Amino acid sequence: MATQVMGQSSGGGSLFNNSGNMGMALPNDMYDLHDLSKAELAAPQLIMLANVALTGEVNGSCCDYLVGEERQMAELMPVGDNHFSDSEGEGLEESAELKGDPSGLDNMELRSLELSVVEPQPVFEASAAPEVYSSNKDPAPEAPVAEDKCKNLKAKPFRCKPCQYEAESEEQFVHHIRVHSAKKFFVEESAEKQAKARESGASPSEEGEFSKGPIRCDRCGYNTNRYDHYTAHLKHHLRAGDNERVYKCIICTYTTVSEYHWRKHLRNHFPRKVYTCSKCNYFSTEKNNYVQHVRTHTGERPYKCELCPYSSSQKTHLTRHMRTHSGEKPFKCDQCNYVASNQHEVTRHARQVHNGPKPLNCPHCDYKTADRSNFKKHVELHVNPRQFNCPVCDYAASKKCNLQYHFKSKHPTCPSKTMDVSKVKLKKTKRREADLHRDAAAAATEQTDTEQAKTKGVDASARRSERPVKGVGKDVPKEKKPCSNASVVQVTTRTRKSAVETKAAEGKHTDGQTGNNAEKSSKAKKSKRKMDAEAHPSVEPVTEGPVTKKKKTESKPKTSGEVPKGSRVEDRKADKQQSASIKKGGKKTALKTKTAKKGSKLAPKWVGHTEPSSEMAQGGESPVPALTQAVVTPSGSTQTELSSPMDIAQTEPAQMDVSQTGPPQVQRPLPVEPAQLEPSPPQEPPQVEPPACVEPPPPVEPPCPMEPAEMEPSPPMEPSQVEPPPHLEPPLPMELPQVELPPVEDCQKELPPVEHAQTKVAQTGPTQVGAVQEEPLFCLRATSSQANQKVISPKDRAKEKLSVLSEMARQEQVLIEVGLVPVRDSQLLKASKSAPDLPAPPSPLPKGHLRREETPKDQEMFSDGEGNKVSPLEKGGTEEAGESRAELAAPMESTSALSSEQSSNAPDGETLHSECQADSTAVCEMEVDTEQKTDRVPLKDSAVEPVSPLNPRVDPEAAAPAVVASPPITLAESQEIDEDEGIHSHDGSDLSDNMSEGSDDSGLHGARPAPQEATSKSGKEGLAVKVTEGEFVCIFCDRSFRKEKDYSKHLNRHLVNVYFLEEAAEEQE
């Protein structure tokens, strides 16, 4: 092609006017790029290769686009459709044909020599260029017009830019080129060989040699290492269409379909003038670029924005800036409607959104991106590896939530100390040290929390002061929510886990609804986070209901004793109907079966805990005294009169109320309120006792020892609402726990008289529990607030109880209709917290039955005692009542002691209130003792009664609370599950998702489809099992603890982690 162009030059036989010898350069002297090795080729940037003076104008007609172009243009043979081919063979053949023409051949040889000399100057440096051009600025202007060039060239000698050699004649210049090329370049002696080399694929091979990168255009051979440049290049092909012309530089691999860009490129190789910077090595053939560069040294910024202080050294920058004021966005993405004010923004958009080129490659891995900020963050992970490191393995996470998931999936059995994400600190460099510090801090915190909880509990019980209890609740919740919860609730000693879980859940709901945040700032934090997670599922129906229920529940405890049985019966009936509908749903049944199984397995452990921790559960009487003493210490009005099953049942309901109130108190840290509640409960228990006496207490106990707890919590709600129809209470199972306890409900039905009192008490407590379950955590706190209200005004309480009972029944019905579990469950959960005896009947009757079967008679007795308290409330089912009575026969023996304790606890409303206080004070002691006993008993419990994990304390008192407590545990579990779901379901934690879905109180039923109920059942069962496995079982990691202390600490960590995760999930949402 080049030969063709040169041969057709109209300037004469020779391109060099100064020399008439066209044949000086023999064919053997031809230089070509193809003959040069890759190392010998000059870099394209080294534009000053050789100002080869082409003396003739390029008027040739071989290429229309070359007409009128400078000689340099002729040298850089452009390739048109007619001339271009992938192999360049066509042009070479033409050049071979022209060999016969001496002028054409000589011209080509000369041009080739000049080009070859010019190209292969790897030695050439930018710094040299400035000197050459600065000294030779006059001869430089050879590019403008062919005619001008010819004139200039005629008057001036030939110059070799690389070495600054100047020749007066073409002959000298050619000779110099040969010498120069002999030193620097590989010289092809034969023009034929050179032509053959080109034809044989010199172009592909050389292009490969010259290629700047792995990206090559199949149509024109364009090479680049920039994908975006390649895509831009392809656009030229697309625009050119059939009339495409590819302009190719013969010196380098540059190709283009744009004549303008091709000409501009040629100036790099044959500049007519170079502007050099006197302060640096910068040089440019474009004056504008040179001027702009100089401004970088001078700091001149002549282009200023009229609308703002912005100024720029370049007009284009100012133009681009002005678009920020006008809002103009002329650049649009080719693949979508994205528009931007700058092209680079569109480019970045295409790379990120449309998987375009990602030039930013991580030097440490294969990560690629087009976003610089993301790139920096990614590289930071290599430089500063993940800050959150697993203390067990080498896993490191960049986020706490990821580390939390890692703990659950990879180290589910590891101790909570080690796995406490809340203790994880950012580690910039030393992972292990940070881990050690974190572990040590966690251990210290746990110890401190445990000691504080124990001390506070003891002080509270000794002082009977509500404030100390509150302090315990506050301090413990901060450090250990579980511990504080357990401390406040006497019966919850064994069920601390449940209490902790419930408190965590309650903290969430209660903090959101009751405004306990002020009382417990630490809990407020955690509970707020949990509430956010749980609030979505349960807040809609539960928020309103729980708040109202709180008030109602508060009024109930006050008036529960005063409330006529008829109203209670009506409430119970309503509750029973609701629970019946829920039971019909089948969700509760499944949960009951699963929970019953799990509860039966866990119940022995808890029973063991209950027996050793209280020893009174086994001793029967001794436990009662202990409970009674605990109650007396807080309220000072505790009565040990309740020795009969009825009394026990009543006492248990009172305890349930206390436990219910207690857990809320723990959450709310309202120790004083519990004390107040105690005085008012005394009124309630006495009033309730007559009805309780009317109903046979024994049947109450027989109902599922473990399940009764669950059943009872909901029945108490119903009884409080409708005491007369305790038999109607079977619907109460609407609460999942209640569903599990249908037999217990029957027993309760049979024991309506005894449990009417209990029902009243339970109504105060269990009813509240039901409300709490419906509105799990909110209701729990509501219960505590109710207890407070009871303490405040006993008379008002009686009045409020009536209204509250009816309202509670209505609310429960509404909640049930909405698909939420009645608050009773949550209250039961509270009760379970307060009554560790309660088997962990998270699941309904199934667990209760299993517990009964698996649970020894002693356990049954304990559970029966619990059943006595709750069963009447839970159900009026005659069958269950019969069973409970039958079971109560034996359990009543052990329950006799429980009843004595209960009698002491329940005889007076004060007993309940005192229990509340005891929950806050004595219960703290109880919890401490229970923790210690639990430490001993866990094994026994697991061996004795796997079914009733909540039975760690089988004390009569604990037994009754246990019945109520099991549902609370269910709530706690379900609530915590809900928390997990809020957090983990968001993150994809199967366990947490299932658990939370399975929890009726989770509030997820409204948010999620029915399958959740099944999951909630399984989740509750799993939680109950975990809680009841003869030890305190963590619902998060299935880890079991013999001591509530340890469990509370461990659970607190989970809860803290859950808060973090919930926050993250909320932020993402």
Curated annotation (Swiss-Prot):
<dbReference type="GO" id="GO:2000706">
    <property type="term" value="P:negative regulation of dense core granule biogenesis"/>
</dbReference>
<dbReference type="GO" id="GO:0033554">
    <property type="term" value="P:cellular response to stress"/>
</dbReference>
<feature type="modified residue" description="Phosphoserine">
    <location>
        <position position="948"/>
    </location>
</feature>
<dbReference type="GO" id="GO:0000978">
    <property type="term" value="F:RNA polymerase II cis-regulatory region sequence-specific DNA binding"/>
</dbReference>
<feature type="region of interest" description="Disordered">
    <location>
        <begin position="85"/>
        <end position="104"/>
    </location>
</feature>
<keyword id="KW-0963">Cytoplasm</keyword>
<feature type="zinc finger region" description="C2H2-type 7">
    <location>
        <begin position="360"/>
        <end position="382"/>
    </location>
</feature>
<dbReference type="GO" id="GO:0050910">
    <property type="term" value="P:detection of mechanical stimulus involved in sensory perception of sound"/>
</dbReference>
<dbReference type="GO" id="GO:0099563">
    <property type="term" value="P:modification of synaptic structure"/>
</dbReference>
<dbReference type="GO" id="GO:0042802">
    <property type="term" value="F:identical protein binding"/>
</dbReference>
<keyword id="KW-0805">Transcription regulation</keyword>
<dbReference type="GO" id="GO:0005829">
    <property type="term" value="C:cytosol"/>
</dbReference>
<dbReference type="GO" id="GO:0003700">
    <property type="term" value="F:DNA-binding transcription factor activity"/>
</dbReference>
<keyword id="KW-0863">Zinc-finger</keyword>
<comment type="subunit">
    <text>Isoform 1 and isoform 6 form heterodimers. Isoform 6: Forms homodimers and homooligomers; binds to the neuron-restrictive silencer element (NRSE) as monomer. Interacts with SIN3A, SIN3B and RCOR1. Interacts with CDYL. Interacts with EHMT1 and EHMT2 only in the presence of CDYL. Part of a complex containing at least CDYL, REST, WIZ, SETB1, EHMT1 and EHMT2. Interacts (via zinc-finger DNA-binding domain) with ZFP90 (via N- and C-termini); the interaction inhibits REST repressor activity. Interacts (via C2H2-type zinc finger 5) with PRICKLE1. Interacts with FBXW11 and BTRC. Interacts with USP7.</text>
</comment>
<feature type="zinc finger region" description="C2H2-type 2">
    <location>
        <begin position="215"/>
        <end position="237"/>
    </location>
</feature>
<dbReference type="GO" id="GO:0035019">
    <property type="term" value="P:somatic stem cell population maintenance"/>
</dbReference>
<feature type="compositionally biased region" description="Basic and acidic residues">
    <location>
        <begin position="851"/>
        <end position="860"/>
    </location>
</feature>
<dbReference type="GO" id="GO:2000065">
    <property type="term" value="P:negative regulation of cortisol biosynthetic process"/>
</dbReference>
<dbReference type="GO" id="GO:0010468">
    <property type="term" value="P:regulation of gene expression"/>
</dbReference>
<feature type="region of interest" description="Interaction with SIN3B">
    <location>
        <begin position="43"/>
        <end position="57"/>
    </location>
</feature>
<dbReference type="GO" id="GO:0045892">
    <property type="term" value="P:negative regulation of DNA-templated transcription"/>
</dbReference>
<dbReference type="GO" id="GO:0008285">
    <property type="term" value="P:negative regulation of cell population proliferation"/>
</dbReference>
<dbReference type="GO" id="GO:0071466">
    <property type="term" value="P:cellular response to xenobiotic stimulus"/>
</dbReference>
<dbReference type="GO" id="GO:0045893">
    <property type="term" value="P:positive regulation of DNA-templated transcription"/>
</dbReference>
<feature type="zinc finger region" description="C2H2-type 1">
    <location>
        <begin position="158"/>
        <end position="180"/>
    </location>
</feature>
<dbReference type="GO" id="GO:0097150">
    <property type="term" value="P:neuronal stem cell population maintenance"/>
</dbReference>
<dbReference type="GO" id="GO:0045944">
    <property type="term" value="P:positive regulation of transcription by RNA polymerase II"/>
</dbReference>
<feature type="compositionally biased region" description="Basic and acidic residues">
    <location>
        <begin position="554"/>
        <end position="576"/>
    </location>
</feature>
<dbReference type="GO" id="GO:0032348">
    <property type="term" value="P:negative regulation of aldosterone biosynthetic process"/>
</dbReference>
<comment type="function">
    <text>Transcriptional repressor which binds neuron-restrictive silencer element (NRSE) and represses neuronal gene transcription in non-neuronal cells. Restricts the expression of neuronal genes by associating with two distinct corepressors, SIN3A and RCOR1, which in turn recruit histone deacetylase to the promoters of REST-regulated genes. Mediates repression by recruiting the BHC complex at RE1/NRSE sites which acts by deacetylating and demethylating specific sites on histones, thereby acting as a chromatin modifier.</text>
</comment>
<feature type="zinc finger region" description="C2H2-type 6">
    <location>
        <begin position="331"/>
        <end position="354"/>
    </location>
</feature>
<dbReference type="GO" id="GO:0006355">
    <property type="term" value="P:regulation of DNA-templated transcription"/>
</dbReference>
<dbReference type="GO" id="GO:0017053">
    <property type="term" value="C:transcription repressor complex"/>
</dbReference>
<feature type="compositionally biased region" description="Basic and acidic residues">
    <location>
        <begin position="451"/>
        <end position="482"/>
    </location>
</feature>
<feature type="compositionally biased region" description="Basic and acidic residues">
    <location>
        <begin position="498"/>
        <end position="511"/>
    </location>
</feature>
<dbReference type="GO" id="GO:0001227">
    <property type="term" value="F:DNA-binding transcription repressor activity, RNA polymerase II-specific"/>
</dbReference>
<dbReference type="GO" id="GO:0050768">
    <property type="term" value="P:negative regulation of neurogenesis"/>
</dbReference>
<feature type="zinc finger region" description="C2H2-type 5">
    <location>
        <begin position="303"/>
        <end position="325"/>
    </location>
</feature>
<feature type="compositionally biased region" description="Low complexity">
    <location>
        <begin position="894"/>
        <end position="904"/>
    </location>
</feature>
<dbReference type="Pfam" id="PF00096">
    <property type="entry name" value="zf-C2H2"/>
</dbReference>
<keyword id="KW-0678">Repressor</keyword>
